């Protein structure tokens, strides 16, 4: 997992961590049917500002926008947030070896949600917090993401 805690840990943090609802406020407004237009307005100002605030390199921002910088692609990306509203069978623990890479400067996922993920993994689990790294760890510090990921995959081949 990269930057996203287990859903049950996240839901608990929404209830118990006074900061988590504010960190996740964008989840609600991305449900608006016009969200695609809003995030892409003014040459994708919202997206660019968010990524820059998280110290994502300009080249990576341009690469992201080359893929999601149009309405259909952005609608698909925002679909992840919209799908969370759908009721599914209760989610239980994860039963596969799990590596969770999380930046401790993540502005959307707090420490309580991140550290709480361990309770919902019923398999070998490694928590790899990255000091000073934000939500977009793969863009900020790719080598600090790929190294533990490759080690995890070597230990747990698919």
Would you name each region that the model predicts?
Residues 133-146:
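Catalytic histidine-centered segment of alpha/beta-hydrolase-like enzymes
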Residues 1-129, 150-157:
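Flexible "cap/lid" subdomain of the alpha/beta-hydrolase fold that forms the substrate-access gate
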